[in-house]
Amino acid sequence: MTAMDKYGAPNEATETMLVWHNNGPWKRSVVYKKEVPHDFPMPHIDVWEQVVDYRVPVDKFDDLAAYDGSVVVDRTQGEMSARCDKEGANFLALNLADDVVTGRRSVDDARQFYAETVKGMMEGRSSPYLEGLRFRPMSATNDRDMAPMSMMK
């Protein structure tokens, strides 16, 4: 099923992307024309980014970066996104990112579970991790940060 089959016509369309806002569980979904090769857990092309409101504690950024380079956190906007080739893989990536942030899984365990679950998906098996978000997107997630005290004088 394509994004248009599931979510209808995009809210925005440019030469390089299609954008849907507030579609299903997502704050935003973007399908990019530019393909980004990605080899975890197996070679594929990342083209579909999906975004949720989510505040990641600063001390968890390195763990998320080690877990999956296609999971991106924007601290200022309070967003976390996954970019893959299938919506199910984006659900999986974000669900496991939540598991890493909350301490339910280690980085290594999350990577192993991701690889096994994607392999199962390719063989026609499903998992609750592929079917939807297993956490609630947050509210008031933006972090405006602050200027150093030395600049406040």
What is each model feature region?
Residues 1-28, 32-153:
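Non-cytosolic coordination micro-motifs
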